[in-house]
């Protein structure tokens, strides 16, 4: 059966159901904590998060890194969690705090080293009265998964998923950790943070991001790295960390977020009982700091990355600003996942290797950024200049500035944003992060529920107005250049030679024993119903597996062909070109992308060692038309020679930088250890042969791959 008829048959086989109702509840506890409960009974679990409205932007100027340090030590227990004998541990803990204060007053390295050894001895002594890692073990005991935390510029989150039957235990331990916390093992966590700092210092991607933020935000704390400055990391004070906790971790600065299979009416009394015992703290008065405003064109350069890149930075708006959604639409008009944007055309036409536009709206300020990677000429072994790239990017940008786009293009962009929102709403975790962001910025909870209506309401005149207002002649041009050798930024943080800390293996605190004994009403187990996955044999080489989406009317479909790069090495490059292909006889890539966009659909091609994939998502009402359009492209792909030359240049440039990339070297070594001569790095097309790739050959390779057996997942 030909692919066109195959996809149309699939489209007619499927039946659709409306999404299930969900409910968002919001309340404030007596101590000021904000509670969000998003009920979704279709989920098997609950995602729980405690989010604090504090991040690295709130670090004291002379003690940067405290927010991140605190995230690490918040897992070290309290006067009950991890405590085997707090009365004996307490005086040792207080000595450790005093020793760090004593150390901070010294400048002599030898004297500091002597105190470090004293602290190490005290830490080893205190460890005899602590169970060690008990919070994590309690989460494991209740069936929790994905325990983690993260520190950002404006907020800090602690979270994991857990079975609905374990709600009381989760509320108990997450509230208990906020009552009399004990920052045990501070010294060992310093080692972990030092290693993290050194890792970022060696990573060119991290160094590039730091450079961009330093230049974009000037004197604002957003310009500092989240992990902190090295001179402050080398001079830690536990007392300062305790002060930071007491200042920022009060309930009025905290949100409790529960998303998934939960009943708000049953949960609220338990939440009150557990979290209202967390003591209210003094009100916080946060001073908003001024943000750098660009005037005219400002240029900065740095040799820090694997390859050259141009970044154009414009002043934007803070999160929750009335113009934020309109600016999101502007960025989508420039570049988007469907590759229908004004800047996307530069990549589709082969004029530039890669380009994208994005908005980063944070609590105090925001920036708009355009990133562009020049093309690499494999024949001349050189990159295009930053100047030429900036010229063609600005030329395309003028189309946005001048409002050169129509209603149809705008509506397709808005529908794509709505579809991506619907996909996010399928995830408990994504919902929780969105709620945490709303809490952090003080936005109304209705913003998340009414997001689709807000997007639909944005008019073409509003988009044109903000495009002209923000994408103006006042911007920062960052010429990021290739670094042959990356010098260390400042001094690497040397890991101290401490004696290892040994805790009592297998020991449990009385608190842990009590938590584990809390009775649980086991829910009715809902096993996966494999019969709900319907199967249809399309022909001798194609089989369809499909199931209904209970969440919404968004579909995802994957065609999985039984051939990969192990047997067809050139397929890697054929598939890469298919992602930017047009359609014979005369449909150009951008026209094809926009035709898909008008159907609210998105299609991507991928390949691995053993399989080739064609993936499409969209709305069910447009499934038949989207399948018809996709099948025509698969049958009659129009690959572009200019794109091929850009792809070859990209491969040449990428391989040139491999020996300077720690991550790539690690990957190559691991691959060789596992597979020896069958390693992907040894089996790939030699660099010297890339120049001989042709459109005819790659088209033939792709079409041959579509003749292999195919499984379709809907």
Summary of predicted features, one role per range:
Residues 1-7:
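Bacterial N-terminal signal peptides that target proteins for export
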Residues 7-15:
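Bacterial N-terminal signal peptides
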Residues 21-34, 263-302, 344, 447-561, ...:
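Proteolytic maturation boundary segments
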Residues 38, 43-59, 65-66, 83-176, ...:
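M16 family metallopeptidases and their MPP-like homologs
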Residues 69, 73, 329, 573, ...:
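Catalytic glutamate of the conserved HExxH
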Residues 183, 190, 205, 209, ...:
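Non-catalytic, conformational "gating/processing" segments within enzyme and secreted inhibitor domains
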Residues 194-204:
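Carboxylate/His-rich catalytic cores and anion/metal-binding grooves
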Residues 233-244, 580:
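A conserved hydrophobic secondary-structure block that centers on an alpha-helix together
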């Amino acid at each position: 059966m030909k692919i066109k008829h195959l996809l149309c048959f699939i489209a007619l086989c499927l039946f659709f159901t409306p999404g299930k109702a969900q409910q968002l509840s919001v309340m404030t506890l007596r101590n000021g904590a904000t509670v969000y409960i998003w009920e979704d009974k279709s989920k098997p679990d609950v995602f729980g998060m405690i989010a604090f409205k504090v991040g690295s932007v709130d670090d004291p100027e002379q003690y940067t890194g405290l927010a991140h340090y605190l995230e690490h030590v918040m897992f070290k227990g309290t006067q009950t969690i991890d405590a085997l004998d707090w009365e004996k541990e307490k005086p040792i803990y207080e000595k450790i705090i005093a020793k760090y204060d004593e150390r901070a007053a010294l400048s002599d390295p030898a004297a500091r080293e002597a105190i470090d050894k004293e602290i190490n001895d005290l830490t080893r002594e205190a460890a005899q009265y602590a169970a060690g890692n008990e919070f994590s073990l309690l989460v494991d005991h209740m069936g929790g998964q994905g325990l983690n935390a993260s520190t950002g510029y404006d907020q800090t989150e602690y979270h994991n998923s857990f079975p609905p039957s374990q709600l009381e235990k989760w509320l108990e331990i997450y509230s208990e950790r906020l009552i009399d916390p004990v920052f045990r093992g501070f010294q060992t966590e310093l080692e972990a943070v030092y290693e993290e700092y050194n890792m970022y210092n060696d990573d060119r991607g991290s160094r590039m991001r730091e450079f961009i933020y330093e230049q974009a935000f000037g004197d604002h704390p957003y310009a500092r790295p989240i992990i902190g400055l090295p001179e402050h990391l080398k001079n830690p004070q536990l007392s300062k960390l305790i002060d930071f906790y007491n200042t920022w971790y009060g309930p009025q600065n905290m949100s409790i977020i529960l998303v998934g299979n939960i009943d708000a009416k049953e949960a609220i009394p338990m939440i009150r009982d557990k979290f209202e015992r967390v003591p209210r703290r003094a009100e916080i008065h946060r001073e908003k700091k001024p943000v750098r405003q660009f005037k005219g064109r400002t240029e900065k350069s740095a040799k820090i990355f694997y390859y050259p890149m141009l970044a154009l930075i414009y002043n934007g708006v803070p999160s929750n600003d009335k113009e934020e959604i309109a600016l999101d639409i502007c960025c989508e008009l420039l570049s988007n996942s469907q590759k229908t944007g004004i800047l996307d055309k530069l990549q589709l036409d082969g004029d530039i290797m890669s380009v994208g536009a994005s908005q980063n709206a944070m609590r105090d300020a925001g920036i708009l950024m355009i990133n562009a990677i020049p093309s690499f000429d494999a024949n001349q072994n050189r990159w295009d200049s930053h100047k030429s790239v900036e010229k063609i990017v600005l030329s395309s940008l003028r189309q946005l500035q001048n409002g050169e786009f129509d209603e149809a293009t705008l509506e397709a962009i808005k529908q794509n944003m709505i579809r991506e929102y619907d996909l996010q709403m399928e995830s408990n975790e994504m919902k929780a992060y969105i709620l945490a962001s709303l809490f952090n910025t003080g936005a109304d909870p209705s913003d998340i529920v009414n997001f689709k209506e807000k997007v639909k309401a944005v008019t073409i005149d509003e988009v044109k107005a903000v495009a002209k207002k923000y994408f103006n002649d006042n911007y920062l041009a960052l010429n990021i250049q290739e670094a042959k050798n990356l010098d260390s930024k400042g001094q690497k943080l040397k890991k101290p030679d401490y004696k290892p800390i040994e805790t009592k293996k297998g020991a449990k605190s009385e608190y842990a024993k009590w938590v584990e004994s809390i009775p649980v009403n086991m829910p009715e187990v809902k096993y996966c119903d494999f019969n709900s996955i319907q199967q249809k044999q399309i022909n001798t080489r194609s089989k369809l597996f499909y199931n209904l989406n209970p969440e919404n009317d968004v579909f995802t479909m994957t065609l999985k062909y039984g051939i990969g790069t192990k047997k067809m090495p050139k397929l890697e490059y054929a598939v890469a070109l298919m992602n930017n292909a047009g359609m014979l006889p005369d449909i150009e890539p951008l026209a094809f992308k926009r035709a898909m966009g008008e159907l609210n659909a998105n299609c991507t091609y991928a390949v691995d060692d053993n399989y080739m994939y064609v993936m499409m998502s969209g709305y069910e009402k447009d499934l038949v038309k989207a399948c018809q359009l996709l099948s025509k492209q698969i049958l009659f792909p129009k690959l572009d020679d200019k794109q091929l030359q850009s792809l070859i240049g990209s491969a040449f440039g990428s391989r040139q930088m491999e020996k300077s990339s720690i991550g790539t070297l690690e990957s190559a070594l691991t691959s060789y250890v596992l597979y020896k001569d069958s390693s992907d790095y040894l089996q790939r097309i030699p660099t010297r042969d890339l120049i001989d790739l042709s459109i005819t050959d790659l088209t033939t390779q792709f079409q041959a791959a579509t003749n292999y057996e195919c499984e379709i997942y809907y």
